[in-house]
């Protein structure tokens, strides 16, 4: 998620380079150090298969995990406003190589998952908090053909995210093949 973000804070200039692709600002190590790593069940509706209904929760493994702090505007070139923030790095500008890539880059960021926040967790302990008003931390996003998570799906025995992503890649390959086989106008 950090590598694919257009902007990352809590980092030093010359530290982590970004390649971009997701119009988001991430907050690095949002949950703390490695010793504060944890696992949490996540509702991931995008994993539902046709006719299945709500899928079972996915066990997210969060290790020094970032969160999406802000969805940034989709714009050409670098995120100039972000580059002026202290302790923030931005990805270099990139150009689409063809129409399919251009369409993917122009899409807006979709929020695919949130981790319920502190208020939601406290509400289950009898503390008088309106958990409905807190939406939680953004932990999975997609923009066009770029997908990023705060958690490590590869560290679980649950293959659903990998299967879903392989289907997304296959659809993108088919779309590119179809676009290349269409006659030029």
Where do the model's predicted regions map?
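Cysteine-nucleophile active-site neighborhood
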Residues: 1-48
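Amide-donor transfer/coupling interface in amidating biosynthetic enzymes
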Residues: 28-35, 40-185
């Amino acid at each position: 998620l950090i590598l694919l973000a257009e902007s990352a804070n809590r980092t030093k200039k010359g530290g982590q380079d970004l390649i971009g692709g997701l119009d988001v600002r991430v907050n690095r190590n949002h949950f703390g150090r490695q010793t504060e790593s944890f696992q949490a069940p996540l509702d991931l509706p995008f994993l539902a298969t046709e006719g299945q209904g709500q899928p079972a929760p996915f066990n997210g493994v969060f290790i020094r995990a970032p969160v999406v702090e802000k969805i940034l505007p989709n714009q050409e070139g670098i995120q100039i406003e972000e580059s002026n923030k202290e302790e923030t790095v931005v990805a270099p500008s990139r150009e689409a190589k063809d129409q399919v890539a251009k369409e993917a880059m122009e899409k807006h960021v979709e929020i695919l998952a949130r981790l319920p926040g502190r208020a939601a967790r406290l509400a289950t302990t009898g503390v008088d908090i309106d958990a409905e008003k807190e939406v939680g931390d953004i932990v999975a996003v997609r923009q066009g053909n770029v997908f990023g998570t705060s958690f490590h799906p590869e560290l679980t025995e649950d293959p659903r995210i990998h299967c879903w992503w392989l289907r997304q890649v296959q659809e993108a390959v088919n779309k590119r093949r179809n676009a290349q086989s269409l006659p030029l106008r």
